[in-house]
Amino acid sequence: MLRPSSSFRSRLRFARSLATAVPHTAEAASQIRTVGVVGAGQMGLGIGYVAARTAGVQVLLTDRSESQLSKGLAFADALLEKEVKKGKLSKDEALEVRGRLKVVKGIEQFGESGVDLAIEAVSESLPVKQQIFSALATHLPPSAILASNTSSISLSKLAASAISSTTGENRAQSVVGFHFFNPVPVMTLVELIPALQTHPSVVAQARAFAQQMGKTVTASRDSPGFISNRLLMPYINEACIVLETGVASREDIDATMKLGMRHPMGPLELADFIGLDTCLNIMKVLHAETGDSKYRPSVLLDRMVSAQYFGKKSGVGFYDYRPAPPPPPPAVARGAEGGGDAEAPAPYGDSNTA
C-alpha cells in the first residue's frame, strides 16, 4: 500500500492549519477602519486607492518625497475621473473616495490617527524595510497590524525588526506579508504570507480585509519569493540569458511566449513593466536565501541595471519607451551632417547593440 511521504504530510498539515487558522469572517475585516500606507509610489498609491474606493476605509499616505505624494494624489484623481467617465462612480461617490485619501507627514501620525493596519510599500531593500517596521512598532498601538508589500524578502526577518525603540516592545506577532500585484486597481490577487512569529488572528484579519478590498487571497509560507516570484523571476532571468547568449532576439523571445504559450506579455516586455532593478533585487534575494545557482542573476540584467536602464519607468530597458523627438528644422538637419550630438543609448536588442 502506498503511503504519502513525510514531506507531503507536512505540507498537507500546513495547508490545513491555514484553512483553520484563517477564517473568512466579516467581523475580522470590520475591525480595520483606518489604513496607513508607507510609500506613495505606484504600488503604495494603488493599495491606498483600492482600500479607500472598494473597502471604504480612511487611508493615510506618507512618503519621504513630497513630490511623490503629489504625483500619487494626481494619479488617484486621474483614476477617479476615469471611473466617473465610465459610469462606474458618480461624481459624489468619487468625491467621497477622494475624501478618504489623506496625506500625513510621517509614520508618527499613524499612531495619532488610530491606524488599524499599516502597509509598507517601499523598494525591495531589507535595511530600509527594517527601519520602517521599527518605526511602525514604535508609533502604532499594540492592536495594529503591521503589513509588508514585499515581493521576496523574509517576513520573519522583518518581524524580528518590529521592536519599539522607546518601550522595547516586540511586535513580531503583528507582522504579516501582504503582497499586491501591479496595477493594484486591476490585479485581483493578494499573496498572504505569515512570518514564523505571526499570530493566527492577524492572518485572519489580513485575509478578511483583502477580501473586503475585492481581492482573491493565496497563502504561502515565508519562503524566498513566495509563490509568484519563486516561479516568475527565474523565467524572466532565463529569458535574459537566452538574449545575452544570442539564442534569439528580444522580439522572437517575446513573440514565442505570447503567440506560442498565450502569455499576455513576453518575459522581456514584462521585465520592463515590472522594473529591471526590481527583477534584479528579487533574483539576488532568491540566490542569497537559497544558495542555489539556478537563481544567479543574468549578467545582462545586472549590467543593464548598472547602466540605469530600468525599463518603462526610466524610458529605456529591453525596449525604448521614450517619445520620438520631432524632426529638426531643415537648416539644422543640413548643419548636422558629418557631426552633431551623439545618439541616445538604444535599448538592448536593437540591431546596433545585439
Regions found by a protein language model. Give the residues of each.
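NAD(P)-dependent Rossmann-like dehydrogenase/reductase catalytic/cofactor-binding core
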Residues: 2-33, 55-56, 201-204, 211-222, ...
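Structural/interface elements that position substrates and couple domains in central-metabolism enzymes
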Residues: 60, 215, 232-236
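A general alpha-helix detector
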Residues: 79, 188-189, 235-242, 266, ...
